[in-house]
């Protein structure tokens, strides 16, 4: 794939892989949504490279869960990701203690050391234009509304990182359905583009107001303290192992 480079206002050269009039259907896997998409205004930007193995808040009525290949989605009630409670919801609704989840991958980076994490996109803008769809969220370190699967124009975003061999059988089928689904958008392009990921939207403003509150500062200090304590523990173990001439792990 070749790069198209153009001058941008700050004098740097920003690489692009596709022209803005590209109208062929395409599926973005994980961070490819950001690397390839955002340069041409696709809303699949890099919110966090922290998507794990489960999906939640998925639209069960969406076509990718119904065909062309038949699939029966297995759901399980699991605890709401703890990180999600750090974010205020723009609809003002409290988060439940547990969520209905669907297993997409057989492995995830949280339980499998060295496994590649997926990427989630910012949710703002997936519901305010006819060319975009929110399809599913996923377990991550960000808010509950972050996008793990979605569509913008002729681009389908599959934020999960696993190759087919590490997908569940159900996910393999849904992925095939997603490829078939996005093919219907051949000849179309995004209508409302977003070139700046943190552009001030109503949702972003609400979230930022919450972030600067004293309550959130206190919570952040607790997290920072826990991180420092964990780091010191790892350091202590690593130094002891090093003194004995033992091999250190990648984390150490």
Show where each model-derived region lies.
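A short linear-motif detector with a strong N-terminal bias
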Residues: 7-8, 112-115, 135-138
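An acidic, glycine-rich "communication" segment
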Residues: 28-129
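Solvent-exposed loop/turn segments at secondary-structure junctions
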Residues: 3-9, 32-36, 70-71, 140-142, ...
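Short, structured coil/loop segments at alpha-helix boundaries
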Residues: 8-15, 61-71, 82, 167-168, ...
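Helical hinge/lid and interdomain linker segments adjacent to catalytic or ligand-binding clefts
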Residues: 1-38, 216, 220-222, 226, ...
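A generic local structural motif
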Residues: 12-15, 120-122, 143-144
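Extracellular/periplasmic catalytic domains that process cell-envelope and extracellular macromolecules
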Residues: 19-22, 57-58, 127-128, 149-151
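Extracellular ligand-binding/catalytic regions of CAZymes and related secreted enzymes
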Residues: 128-252
């Amino acid at each position: 794939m070749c790069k198209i480079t153009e001058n941008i206002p700050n004098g740097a050269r920003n690489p692009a892989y596709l022209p803005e009039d590209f109208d062929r259907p395409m599926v973005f896997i994980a961070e490819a949504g950001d690397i390839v998409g955002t340069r041409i205004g696709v809303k699949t930007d890099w919110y966090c490279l922290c998507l794990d193995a489960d999906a939640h808040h998925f639209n069960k009525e969406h076509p990718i869960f119904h065909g062309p290949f038949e699939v029966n989605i297995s759901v399980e009630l699991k605890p709401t990701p703890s990180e999600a409670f750090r974010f205020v919801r723009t609809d003002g609704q409290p988060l439940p203690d547990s969520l209905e989840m669907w297993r997409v991958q057989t492995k995830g980076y949280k339980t499998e050391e060295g496994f590649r994490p997926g990427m989630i996109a910012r949710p703002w803008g997936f519901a305010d234009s006819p060319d975009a769809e929110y399809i599913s969220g996923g377990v991550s370190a960000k808010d509950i509304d972050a996008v793990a699967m979605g569509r913008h124009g002729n681009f389908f975003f599959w934020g999960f990182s696993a190759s087919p061999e590490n997908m569940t059988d159900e996910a393999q089928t849904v992925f095939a359905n997603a490829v078939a689904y996005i093919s219907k958008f051949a000849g179309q392009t995004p209508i409302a583009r977003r070139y700046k990921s943190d552009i001030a939207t109503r949702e972003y403003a609400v979230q930022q107001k919450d972030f600067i509150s004293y309550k959130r500062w206190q919570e952040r200090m607790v997290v920072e303290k826990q991180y420092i304590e964990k780091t010191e523990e790892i350091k202590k173990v690593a130094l002891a192992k090093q003194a004995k001439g033992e091999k250190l792990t990648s984390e150490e």
